[in-house]
């Protein structure tokens, strides 16, 4: 059935191994981020043999699905108070930035007779999660170390995801300095200094990843074969692991300019149309509800995506060398947004090759 995402599992496994080896070259361990695939068990179990330190996801529901796999589990998103019991049950380690949440995790861990490991997040300017002021961080560390069922395993930072701040040697060196200060002041080991995500990968090849960084959380680079600070492909990696295949449900020649007064579309946007005369247009059975249309790229480079509503994708096929007909399949490469939404959609099948 269509639409469907195909996954070349051998290429994905090769990418995961490449990332693990690259991180080792940079002197750090790897957490493979599987959230963009909704931690699809059939896929992630194929990566278990790569033997990285952690599988990482933002949703505890996804980590719960992976409980039978040997690789440890890392919760990326700082926990909600309503899920602390599940966090202790299904995550080997979680990222945190709120004392009240850590107290709740401690209580849940005590009830479950477990010690829960945590990474304390530091904000170095991207302005998402983490302690921003050094004194605030240290005052909270004083309280956290009193929690008998919580073990501080390390500190971490998020960069690029919200504020688009690019990881550099100087800001990641600051993270290492903070770790050293905490080790000295509080007699902590802090084996994990997590220096960000796929946007930090480029520093390894440049030889600029600080020695004190011991962990990277890598998702997009593994999936799409590129670093995310500047969007460059990584030589030696596969960038065609995932493809989206959609079926044509209508194929007709129509004017390129809508007829009548133009208002706003289904999403409140006022579209712009260029008058190119009569064009052959294919309607595909997929839409904005299913994926991020803006990050789809047709394999047939003679095709042009014109736009989409909730359930329909309109493609100009006039210039293609292929004579398309109703029922034919059009294949797309997928960017990060398309992949993320596509895996989340229950209306798109997933097929391992």
From Swiss-Prot:
Record-annotated active site: 35 (proton acceptor)
Q: List the cofactors.
A: pyridoxal 5'-phosphate
UniProt keyword terms in alphabetical order: Isomerase, Pyridoxal phosphate
Which SUPFAM superfamilies is this protein grouped with? PLP-binding barrel
Highest taxon listed in the record's lineage:
Bacteria
Q: Which residues bind substrate?
A: 128
Q: What is this protein called?
A: Ornithine racemase
Q: Which organism is it from?
A: Acetoanaerobium sticklandii (strain ATCC 12662 / DSM 519 / JCM 1433 / CCUG 9281 / NCIMB 10654 / HF)
Q: What is the lineage of its organism?
A: Bacteria, Bacillati, Bacillota, Clostridia, Peptostreptococcales
UniProt lists the gene as orr
């Amino acid at each position: 059935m269509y639409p469907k995402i195909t996954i070349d599992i051998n290429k994905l496994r090769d990418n995961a191994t490449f990332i693990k080896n690259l991180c080792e070259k940079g002197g750090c361990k790897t957490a493979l981020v599987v959230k963009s695939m909704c931690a699809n068990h059939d896929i992630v179990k194929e990566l278990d043999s790569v033997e990285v330190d952690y599988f990482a996801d933002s949703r505890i529901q996804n980590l719960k699905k992976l409980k039978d796999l040997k690789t440890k589990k890392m919760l990326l998103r700082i926990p909600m108070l309503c899920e602390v019991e599940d966090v202790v049950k299904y995550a080997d380690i979680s990222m945190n930035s709120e004392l009240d949440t850590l107290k709740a995790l401690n209580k849940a861990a005590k009830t479950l007779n477990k010690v829960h490991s945590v990474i304390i997040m530091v904000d170095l300017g991207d302005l998402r999660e983490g302690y921003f002021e050094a004194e605030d961080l240290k005052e909270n560390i004083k309280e956290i170390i009193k929690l008998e069922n919580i073990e501080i395993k390390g500190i971490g930072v998020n960069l690029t995801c919200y504020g688009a701040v690019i990881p550099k040697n100087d800001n990641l060196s600051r993270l290492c300095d903070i770790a050293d200060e905490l080790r000295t002041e509080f007699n902590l080991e802090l084996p994990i200094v997590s220096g960000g995500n796929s946007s930090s990968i480029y520093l390894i090849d440049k030889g600029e990843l600080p020695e004190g960084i011991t962990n990277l959380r890598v998702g997009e680079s593994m999936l799409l074969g590129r670093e995310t600070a500047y969007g460059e492909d990584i030589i030696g990696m596969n960038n065609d692991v995932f493809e989206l295949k959609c079926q044509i449900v209508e194929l007709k020649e129509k004017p390129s300019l809508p007829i009548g007064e133009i208002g706003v579309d289904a999403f409140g946007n006022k579209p712009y149309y260029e008058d190119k005369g009569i064009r052959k247009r294919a309607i595909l059975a997929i839409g904005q509800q299913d994926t991020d249309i803006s990050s789809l790229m047709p394999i047939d480079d003679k095709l042009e995506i014109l736009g989409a509503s909730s359930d329909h994708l309109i493609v100009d096929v006039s210039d293609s060398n292929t004579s398309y007909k109703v029922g034919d399949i059009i294949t797309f490469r997928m960017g990060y947004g398309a992949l993320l939404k596509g895996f989340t959609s229950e209306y798109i099948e997933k097929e391992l090759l």
